[in-house]
Amino acid sequence: HEPAEKLIRWNAVAGVVALLVGGILALLVTTTRWQAIHLLPPDWFYLVLTAHGLDMLVFWIIFFEIAVLYFAAAVLLKCRLATPRIAWVAFWLMILGAIINNVAVFRGDSSVMFTSYAPMGAHPAFYLGLILFAVGALVACFVFFGTLVVAKSEGTYNGSVPLVTFGAVTAAIIAVFTIASGAIILIPTF
């Protein structure tokens, strides 16, 4: 289970790093909204708010979800990860997408928060980062589904899957539809 354990750790750590960055940005947003301090100028406020929202509501949650999916399949069902190399490609696509997106925001031309469609267009790198992240997350979800098939075919469990794994299956199905819809909507903007 070593490839799965490494991927679980790396995805969880990436999620915690995104949470930390988003938390620091939340402090900047809070101190700006506090009239006594008013830390950031208006143009930086929306820039920081955009990065905070993406790091906290997209990157942290999805990195952590992928870690949970791999745990629920490989560890709880005691089987090997279906395609570890493809899982690593998915992870690095997600990392690359998150970095590109944050760089695009902090360059100052992508402070659109979650309204990144006309007329509030952002730099193409902003959309590229989100699309790469989404593709990586989708690939990771399919690795999870493949791992479930491996577990069933190798007979690593009897009867139905554990409740946590069932919950992970439900979360992965919702994630696939949500992430795919989001990525498809963003493709024309890129």
What role is predicted for each listed range?
Residues 1-190:
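Membrane-embedded and interfacial regions of multi-pass energy-transducing membrane proteins
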